[in-house]
Every structure is written in structure tokens, then in C-alpha cells.
């Protein structure tokens, strides 16, 4: 089975939109899920941390019609709290600047004994 590529440009479009709307994610990345051979767009922001379920519902209402969100697919987007285990693990290995929209491919790395098969990181503060 061929591993798909993350939708890098669509993710970049979406993080720009979120920044413009004042969401300012502190974590925004594609994470590869090998069991399903799919990518998940993972994001976190202090403004979304209080109630993740409500944050996701609000996200759908405000951004669900955005072209980038439709192309990515809502089922491929996860909003997680800032203290999420995956984010904490990744932050031990890599961080980007606050407000930056980088492009760091993080492939086949072991962090604290955990294999990170693939990730594409725009922002991780």
C-alpha cells in the first residue's frame, strides 16, 4: 500500500485563516496514522482548551464552509488540549516560533522511546 502525502498547502491555508480570525494555534500539524494509512490534522490553541467538544462544534460552525476545511474533511481534523500526550512528546524534540508557519517534516524518529512514523509540523510552541 502506498503511503499518501499530507495536504500541506491546504493545512497552510487553514492555519493562515485561523491566525487571521485570532485563534492563533499553538500546535498545528499533520500526523500520520499508519494503521489507517491516513493523515490527521491536529491543532491546539489556548482559546480552544476549555471544552474540546464545544470548540470542535464552534470550529465547524465558523470554518466548516472554508474551502480548505472541506478539502481536508472534518473527519480528518482533531482539536486537542495543549497538554495532549502527542503534543508533549513532540515538543520534547522540536519547537517552532510562536506565530510562525514553518514546514518541518519529522519522519521516522524515535522520541522518548516512541516511534513517530511521520508528521508535518507548521507550528509547535
Regions from the PLM with identified roles:
Residues 1-10:
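N-terminal presequence-like segments and adjacent domain-start helices
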Residues 17-26, 67-71:
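Short secondary-structure junctions
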Residues 22-39:
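Short edge beta-strands and adjacent turn/loop segments
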Residues 31-34, 46-47, 125:
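Short, flexible beta-strand-to-coil junctions
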Residues 51-72:
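Short, non-transmembrane amphipathic alpha-helical segments
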Amino acid at each position: 500500500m502506498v503511503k499518501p502525502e499530507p495536504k500541506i498547502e491546504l493545512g497552510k491555508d487553514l492555519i493562515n485563516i485561523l491566525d487571521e480570525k485570532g485563534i492563533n494555534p499553538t500546535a498545528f500539524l499533520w500526523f500520520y496514522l499508519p494503521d489507517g494509512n491516513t493523515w490527521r490534522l491536529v491543532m491546539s490553541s489556548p482559546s480552544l482548551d476549555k471544552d474540546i467538544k464545544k470548540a470542535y462544534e464552534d470550529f465547524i460552525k465558523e470554518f466548516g464552509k472554508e474551502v480548505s476545511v472541506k478539502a481536508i474533511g472534518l473527519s480528518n481534523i482533531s482539536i486537542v488540549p495543549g497538554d495532549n500526550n502527542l503534543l508533549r512528546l513532540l515538543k520534547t524534540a522540536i519547537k517552532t516560533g510562536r506565530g510562525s508557519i514553518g514546514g518541518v517534516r519529522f519522519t521516522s524518529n524515535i522520541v522518548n522511546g516512541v516511534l513517530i512514523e511521520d508528521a508535518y509540523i507548521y507550528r509547535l510552541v
